[in-house]
Amino acid sequence: MKKIVVALFITGLMLSCTSVFAQGKYGADSANCIKYLSYYKEYYKQQNYKESLPSWRKAYKTCPPTASQNMLLDGSSMIRNLIENNAKNETYRKALLDTLMTLHNVRMQNYPRLV
């Protein structure tokens, strides 16, 4: 009986320790993730994509893809806007298309039901 109690105690202790090491929705650097998500979102709401894009890029690098599906959707929208505005610069346009396809792939991997 004593061995069972000790085994249950150790199991409970190990399970409680794993939750301490979990990173949560916003990843290891959650403060910066939330900050950059907030910054880009405010500019995005105003359709000020030029000001929104640098903060979005920082959010995309800092946050895990599972932090916000809207981060991926908004990024796709901003990249499409850049593609339209830079139709004459073929090299830049190809790089933007590659970025857009990467965003779509990341979204399909993390949100397969919603694609």
What are these regions, as identified by a protein language model?
Residues 7-16:
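Bacterial N-terminal signal peptides
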Residues 6, 20-98, 113-114:
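N-terminal leader/linker segments that initiate helical-solenoid repeat arrays
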Residues 62, 103-110:
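Residue position in alpha-helical solenoids
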